[in-house]
């Protein structure tokens, strides 16, 4: 007897015995997902989650209606970090099949690397894995990569990455990857993508409680997401030169670790007083944004699991978008809508840049005053390291990267959310 479940789409309401609001019913042919008069992709994703929860380990999507978007919705819900399930679908035409496979490949990289234990993804491993993934999807000869590590970071002026990671026995690293499909080594760098790559965040001396620390293997989710986004953009035909910069460190406690009251002097001359060692993501991103600005690109995008404030505002279903460039923000929101991913703007204004006072340095690494808008002040901090921060810079505070427990749409763990939005945005802007 076959253990494979055939799953069909139905616009009809389930028979009464299945319940008034039944999403799934069964007959002699297999299972029916009742999507309503129009095909509701959210219902498909929720139904797929039910199949996984029930332990149905092999599914074939059968019958009519299974286009790219419907299959993609099912895949997202059915996918489990233990990866014991098998999914097959009806034949698609070549272009549609290529698009579906590209999405799956990019998001599988992102979800897998975020879900891995921190013991398996040290800072240098993260940089190496990201470079290997981009090489695997890019045309031959279009990718070069350099990993700056340990004391070489100091020699080249990347003080933030080194300072955050110096408390760990696992050396910090900066990935400088160059994707150049133009064939011209002197082609201008069109965009720079910067990712926060904190492979484990204990909080440092501003230590986290266990119930906040237990998911901190995922604090490199910004790097995982932006790498997946670039990979998907390449598979969709990105034709301009882009640099990927990952700022990788482990935030640990030791006699060498960063201390409260320390001052970091950055390559652009800015000094930063450390008032909270758990606000470390912005310290490593600052180096990446300085390097990005040195390339004089038209577009800078950074991705980071940066603040609890963004998650408190938006929950797990949206990433936060912060920028001074409102026209570019609208383009990003349009890309998210087209890809059916959650993205929501949070405020970022000039006065937020004045909310980082320090008695001993140019800036503090945390906002001051009562009711500090944490996501906004974190983005404001980053703006000091972007040369032209008012134009062409987007900051994604990745609230929806990882779930500690399953929901009705997602398994526990990484979601891959944002990968498709970033790819869409890159390709659309490059083609203008």
UniProtKB/Swiss-Prot annotation:
Domain of life: Bacteria
Binding residues annotated for Mn(2+) 2, in chain numbering: 196, 201, 219, 280
Active site: 208, 282
Cofactor binding note from Swiss-Prot or TrEMBL: Binds 2 manganese ions per subunit.
InterPro entries: Leucine_aapep/pepB, M17_PepB-like_N, Pept_M17_PepB, Peptidase_M17_C
Entry keyword Metal-binding: yes
Predominant cellular place of this UniProt entry's protein: cytoplasm
Keyword Cytoplasm: yes
Gene3D superfamilies xref list: Zn peptidases (3.40.630.10)
Subcellular location field: Cytoplasm
Keywords: Aminopeptidase, Cytoplasm, Hydrolase, Manganese, Metal-binding, Protease
EC number: 3.4.11.23
Annotated positions binding Mn(2+) 1: 201, 278, 280
Cellular component terms (Gene Ontology): cytoplasm
Cofactor(s) in the UniProt record: Mn(2+)
Record-annotated membrane-spanning stretches: none
Cystine pairs: none
Gene Ontology MF annotations: manganese ion binding; metalloaminopeptidase activity
Catalyzed chemical reaction(s): Release of an N-terminal amino acid, Xaa, from a peptide or arylamide. Xaa is preferably Glu or Asp but may be other amino acids, including Leu, Met, His, Cys and Gln
GO biological process assignments: proteolysis
Subunit structure: Homohexamer.
Function comment: Probably plays an important role in intracellular peptide degradation.
Assigned protein family: Belongs to the peptidase M17 family.
Record-given protein name: Peptidase B
């Amino acid at each position: 007897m076959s253990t494979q479940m055939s799953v069909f789409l139905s616009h009809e309401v389930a028979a009464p015995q299945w319940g008034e609001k039944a999403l799934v019913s069964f007959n002699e042919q297999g299972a029916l997902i009742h999507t309503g008069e129009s095909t509701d992709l959210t219902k498909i994703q929720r139904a797929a989650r039910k199949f996984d929860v029930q332990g149905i380990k092999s599914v074939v999507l059968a019958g009519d209606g299974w286009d790219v978007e419907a299959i993609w919705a099912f895949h997202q819900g059915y996918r489990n970090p233990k990866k014991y399930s098998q999914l097959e679908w009806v034949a698609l035409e070549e272009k549609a099949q290529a698009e579906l496979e590209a999405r799956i490949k990019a998001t599988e990289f992102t979800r897998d690397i975020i879900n891995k234990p921190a013991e398996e993804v040290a800072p240098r491993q993260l940089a190496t894995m990201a470079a290997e993934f981009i090489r695997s999807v890019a045309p031959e000869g279009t990718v070069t990569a350099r990993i700056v590590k340990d004391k070489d970071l100091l020699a080249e002026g990347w003080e933030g990455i080194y300072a955050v990671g110096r408390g760990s026995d696992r050396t910090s690293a900066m990935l400088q990857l160059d994707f150049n499909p133009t064939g011209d080594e002197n082609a201008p760098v069109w965009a720079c993508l910067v990712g926060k790559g904190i492979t484990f965040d204990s909080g440092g001396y501003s230590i986290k409680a266990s119930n906040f620390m237990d998911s901190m293997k995922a604090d490199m989710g910004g790097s995982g997401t932006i790498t997946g986004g670039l990979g998907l953009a390449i598979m969709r035909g990105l034709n301009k030169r882009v640099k990927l910069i990952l700022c990788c460190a482990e935030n640990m406690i030791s006699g060498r670790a960063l201390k409260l009251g320390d001052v970091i002097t950055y390559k652009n001359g800015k000094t930063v007083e450390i008032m909270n060692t758990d606000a470390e993501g912005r310290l490593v991103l600052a180096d990446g944004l300085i390097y990005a600005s040195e390339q004089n690109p038209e577009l800078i995008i950074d991705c980071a699991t940066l603040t609890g404030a963004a998650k408190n505002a938006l929950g797990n279903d949206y990433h936060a978008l912060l920028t001074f460039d409102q026209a570019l923000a609208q383009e990003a929101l349009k890309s998210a809508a087209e890809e059916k991913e959650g993205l929501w703007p949070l405020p970022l204004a000039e006065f937020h840049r004045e909310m980082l006072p320090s008695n001993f340095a140019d800036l503090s690494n945390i906002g001051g005053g009562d009711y500090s808008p944490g996501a906004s002040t974190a983005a404001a901090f980053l703006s000091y390291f972007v040369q032209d921060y008012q134009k062409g810079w987007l900051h994604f505070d990745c609230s929806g990267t990882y779930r500690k427990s399953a929901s009705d749409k997602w398994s526990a763990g990484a979601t891959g959310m944002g990968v498709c939005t970033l790819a869409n945005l890159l390709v659309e802007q490059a083609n203008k």
